[in-house]
A protein has these predicted regions:
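N-terminal signal peptide c-region/cleavage motif recognized by signal peptidases
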Residues: 12-14
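Hydrophobic/aromatic side chains embedded in well-ordered alpha-helices
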Residues: 7-8, 63
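Exported/periplasmic ABC-transporter solute-binding proteins
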Residues: 18-43, 47-52, 56, 60-64, ...
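Short acidic/histidine-rich motifs immediately flanking catalytic phosphotransfer sites
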Residues: 66-68
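Sec-dependent signal peptide recognition
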Residues: 1-7
């Protein structure tokens, strides 16, 4: 009887018959990952689900037992720490993209960061690598005059973007890949490079097929088109 029910479920959900993958992904990369995955879904029928949040929040969930097959973080250290905590091979952590910062909402370029009257949104630096990069930029001496500004910290870069888009703040320091209209690029030497790493938490035939897809030239082009730099 149980086998009959299972066969009915597989018939009703043909994607499940080809396997499934559960992915935890840093909020900045979710839109790109969805675009990257669309051709994979069409070609394989493997079902992919996403859970997006800041890197720190996702790592905490994983270390407390949340079940995912892959974890796409927005930094290098967190996936390596997760791999070590779960006794996973170091080779299961890999670089998939390099990100950069932009300032959205400024009419005066980057000099607006020195204006205390301009409110600013960033991702929470305690849990989001792009938030930490933003704090490095704000700590520069030329922006010390702006230290009295209203600084709003979102739970993730996605929420920081929402704060700016809704008009709750004047400006936002965001990943370039979020493609905020009219944003100004922040020089790369103003903050530590944002190398984004992933880690394989659970190997399966579906996961291994997905990893092979991620290494393809097609995916590298999609990631570059989305506003990231490819890994070496």
């Amino acid at each position: 009887m149980r086998m009959f029910i299972l066969l009915l479920l597989l018939a009703a959900n043909p994607l499940w018959a080809n396997g499934s993958i559960s992915i935890a992904v840093a909020a900045n990369f979710k839109p790109t990952l969805e675009k990257v995955t669309e051709p994979f879904l069409a070609n394989t029928g493997i079902f992919v689900t996403y859970s997006a949040a800041s890197t720190g929040v996702l790592a905490t969930q994983i270390l407390h037992g949340a079940q995912y097959d892959l974890f796409f973080a927005a930094d290098e250290d967190t996936p390596q720490k997760v791999a070590a905590a779960k006794a996973l091979p170091a080779s299961d952590a890999f670089c998939y993209a390099r990100g950069s910062l932009v300032l959205a909402g400024s009419e005066d370029g980057l000099s607006a960061l020195a204006q205390p009257g301009q409110s600013l949104a960033i991702a929470n630096p305690a849990t989001a690598p792009y938030g930490r990069a933003a704090m490095e930029v704000l700590a520069r001496p030329e922006f010390s005059a702006g230290q009295g500004r209203k600084l709003v910290k979102g739970n993730s870069v996605a929420q920081a973007l929402q704060f700016w888009q809704s008009g709750a703040v004047d400006m936002a320091l965001l990943p370039r890949a979020l493609q905020a209209a009219g944003a100004v690029e922040v020089p790369l030497d103003w903050y530590q490079p944002v190398a984004q790493y992933a880690v394989v938490l659970n190997h399966s035939a579906a996961v291994d097929e997905y990893l092979q897809w991620l290494r393809s030239d097609t995916v590298r082009s999609l990631i570059t088109d989305a506003g990231y730099e490819p890994c070496p």
